[in-house]
């Protein structure tokens, strides 16, 4: 949500997609999320810039090996820095920019996009997490108009300290129910 508040054009594009695909007579449902391509692009770009954890779960090398030309003795603890991989200029054009459109073309999420890990040790909750994120963010976008707190300027995206990279400054946002969704919200 923080990134969308700083990029209102992306927020409006996601809202327009939801309105066109789902309408305003019901809430976004689980079956809708796979059809909301731009919303999924927003989620992918957000997870690229701010993975849930900056490094994957540590692993231990079972034997001597070479990684990137470096000798790694057996028994060495290995960490994969997803945060750095997702911001590597060799893999991503303009890596610090929030550009959900980069995921619109086929194969854009390829090898270098791995917020949940990859292979046998990939997070088993990835599908559930993406479905839940799609439902929650989609519903928030569908039901409310969002803005940064008046006079605050852009949302501060500075990172705090912690395993999950929390914001240094907690998010404060203003939301107003969308007039077209008031009847649906009343029925909840």
What are these regions (language model features)?
Residues 1-19, 46, 73, 77-81, ...:
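Central I-helix of cytochrome P450 enzymes
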Residues 8-10, 126-166, 170:
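Cytochrome P450 heme-binding "Cys pocket" and the immediately downstream C-terminal segment
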Residues 27-68, 89:
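Conserved cytochrome P450 K-helix E-x-x-R motif and the immediately C-terminal K′/meander segment
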Residues 33, 50, 62-64, 80-106:
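Conserved cytochrome P450 K-helix/beta-meander segment immediately N-terminal to the heme-binding cysteine loop
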Residues 68, 104-133, 158-161:
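Cytochrome P450 heme-thiolate "Cys pocket" and heme-binding signature region
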Residues 77, 84-85, 120-121, 135, ...:
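Conserved beta-strand elements of beta-rich interaction domains across eukaryotes
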Residues 166-188:
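C-terminal helix/juxtamembrane-tail motif
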